[in-house]
């Protein structure tokens, strides 16, 4: 899925969530003209042919956010070897730096984040089989929904290094699936800097 590969890193570098969510709507939305609704495309943020995402992202604090989007958008997420540790690699006169021989790196915060995302993907069917709906968006904050017959999840993120509030048309009672905190939503959601939340609707 090269369209979303480009949309992912470009959206963060240009502070423009509209780019990637346009692609997600175009590919996986509910309208009859959407391209791949119900299909499972192979998604990635880097591979052996392109520069490592840790080298492309201008703000490394956004790495957990881009991986959250990779694992929660429709499709099959792929982690290129070494990127779970956040290693860098840029193209020079050849591609050697993109696929180096590496020793085992020490576990770090990004590795921990990716492991949690793998666990979420395996244990929440909506992330694998649910439909996709955009809930709210600004240039730097977004919420989208994954829903199947078992559950309804909202993926909520703020790419900015400052708090902000995202207003949208939607409400309900939710639980943060990481903290089990109850989160009542009434047409707005407040974000901390660089915050990602996955909320499960309970009523």
Task: For the regions a language model picked out, list residue spans one by one.
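Conserved alpha/beta catalytic core and glycan-binding cleft of carbohydrate-active enzymes
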Residues: 1-92, 138-139, 146-148, 155, ...
């Amino acid at each position: 899925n090269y369209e979303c590969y480009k949309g992912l890193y470009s959206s963060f570098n240009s502070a423009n969530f509209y780019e990637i969510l346009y692609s997600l709507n175009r590919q996986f939305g509910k309208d009859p003209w959407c391209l791949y609704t119900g299909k499972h495309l192979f998604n990635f943020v880097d591979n052996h042919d392109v520069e490592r995402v840790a080298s492309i992202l201008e703000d490394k604090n956004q790495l957990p956010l881009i991986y959250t989007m990779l694992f929660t958008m429709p499709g099959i997420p792929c982690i290129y070897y070494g990127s779970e540790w956040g290693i860098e690699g840029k193209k020079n006169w050849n591609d050697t730096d993109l696929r180096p021989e590496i020793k085992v790196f020490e576990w770090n915060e990004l590795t921990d984040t990716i492991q949690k995302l793998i666990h979420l993907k395996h244990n929440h069917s909506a992330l694998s089989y649910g439909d996709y709906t955009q809930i709210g968006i600004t240039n730097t904050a977004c919420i989208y929904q994954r829903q199947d017959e078992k559950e309804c999840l909202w993926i909520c993120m703020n790419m900015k290094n400052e708090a902000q509030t995202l207003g949208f048309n939607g409400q309900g009672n939710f639980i943060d699936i990481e903290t089990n905190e109850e989160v009542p939503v009434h047409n707005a959601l407040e974000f901390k800097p660089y915050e990602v939340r996955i909320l499960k609707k309970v009523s």
